[in-house]
Amino acid sequence: MKLTFFTMQFPVSSETFVLNQVTHFIDIGYDVEIIAVFPGDLVNRHAAFDRYNLAAKTHYLLPDDKDGKTAKLAQRLAIILPKILKPGTLKSFHIGRYGAQSSKLLLPAIVAANKKPFAADIFLVHFGYAGALANKLRELKVLQGKQVTVFHGADISRRHILEEHKKDYPRLFAQNELLLPISRLWQHKLIAMGCPAEKINVTRMGIEPEKFNLKLRDALHQPLRILSVARLTEKKGLGVAIEACRILKQQGGCFEYTIIGYGDLEAQLKTAIADGDLEDCVKLVGFKPQEEIKRYLDEADIFLLPSLTAADGDMEGIPVALMEAMAVGLPVVSSEHSGIPELIEHNVSGWLAPEGDAQALAAILLRLSQGEADVVPVVLAARAKVETEFNQHIAYRQLAEILERLA
């Protein structure tokens, strides 16, 4: 089967779920290609990108996007003008039908820039807004094949995305062969938005448990080692985590908190660390490849990710980073946010605080640091949860069966 992954950018270091799906389907013998609208971060990339020679399998529809609205439009216009009379290019200017992706010249630029159609048995598209674009490209004969769209988080929660695609999504629901939300929460939301229930199948983003060695920690380090692995964005709740650490320090807690990742909030988080007098115990260490992240997980005592709904409505799906921590036997502390309670049951397979509640987080961390919780049954239950319900092998086998039936 010819399976083509379609994304807005590739590779993206934080989107390991896309990379892992790509390499899995290569491993089981599929003819795999990747189409990305723009090149991703080719500097901060994971080893699998090179190991599988994915650069040779990836087609970029447009060059690197320029910064700034005016520069973007000028770049796209320069691509469009030589092909302005091409029938598909003219049709792509139908703003009433194609919306913002037309008015911002994204769709016309793609149609103008690509001479031949891309054919596949199935286009597996990650994120709803990319699905909306791919669906239009099918209509304009740039893509030829069936389409399956995966909904993750921001694509179905962020207000400006929902507003921009309020006409696109109903058409996507009607014309796509299948919609794959990653949580039951998003399944219910898709149905509420008008998607036929029979077109929906929940597909989990999972991990490969055998690649994560379960380690039962006999004793906690002193100082306590707390770890987060996340993009530095609002919905990851890292500002709340830092505030919880400030409270924990005031209560006499002795700890080292390491945050792996990069993003737009780096300067803001550094300020929060300095303002909280936490520079001696909270460190931002930037991007780390997957192999090095495993070492950090192995050496930590607690994994912390108190996700929350951002001011613009942006929400998580179910963070893979939590699954990885659960697989290695790290006690996980998170929040009652989005699909996370589908992964973590409070006091059973981890600990959950209300969204944005730094006091509650600090109380959980203090309780764990003082040995007041029986951790071993919880981490064993967490490992069992990811092995059975968030196991990449099971999830991808089920996905392959779905795609085979569809093709």
Swiss-Prot record:
One of its GO terms (biological process) is carbohydrate derivative metabolic process. One of its GO terms (molecular function) is glycosyltransferase activity. Coiled coil: none annotated. Keywords: Exopolysaccharide synthesis, Glycosyltransferase, Transferase, Virulence. It holds the Pfam family Glycos_transf_1. SUPFAM superfamilies: UDP-Glycosyltransferase/glycogen phosphorylase. Pathway: Glycan metabolism; exopolysaccharide biosynthesis. Its EC number is 2.4.-.-. Belongs to the glycosyltransferase group 1 family. Glycosyltransferase 4 subfamily. PANTHER family: COLANIC ACID BIOSYNTHESIS GLYCOSYLTRANSFERASE WCAL-RELATED, GLYCOSYLTRANSFERASE. Involved in the biosynthesis of amylovoran which functions as a virulence factor. This is Amylovoran biosynthesis glycosyltransferase AmsK.
